[in-house]
Amino acid sequence: MNARGASAFVLAKVFRGQSLSSALPPYAADINKSEKARLMDLCYGSLRWFPQIECYLQALLKKPLRPKDLEIKALLISGIYQLLNSETPAYAVVHDSVSAAESLGRPWARSLVNACLLYT
């Protein structure tokens, strides 16, 4: 699993009420060292800017995501965070996020993720 997919799972657990300090270590242990820093940046940064990013995301979506799709919401939030606050090229963020949507087992969300991140 890459850092983007792992961050979606970690953030979804945090949105469900688990603390970041308990949700992050199991996923950080499963990825290589070069991706671990990226995972931590995506998780901490997304949560730091969560209120602003969530308002922005609500403006992009025609209707809210279902509660069972928290991983997709987390993927969108981490993608928007990275687009706004990192020097990673936008095309790379969009491509990684769309690929992660499919690897999360939600291929229907690829077009949603693509559209939301392209408008960011």
What are these regions (language model features)?
Residues L104:
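A short alpha->loop->secondary-structure connector
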Residues M1-K63, I80-Y81, E87:
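N-terminal interaction/assembly modules
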Residues A37-M40, W108-A115:
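Σ70-family region 2.3-2.4 aromatic/basic alpha-helix that recognizes the −10 promoter
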Residues Y119-T120:
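Conserved small/polar residues in nucleotide/adenosyl-binding loops
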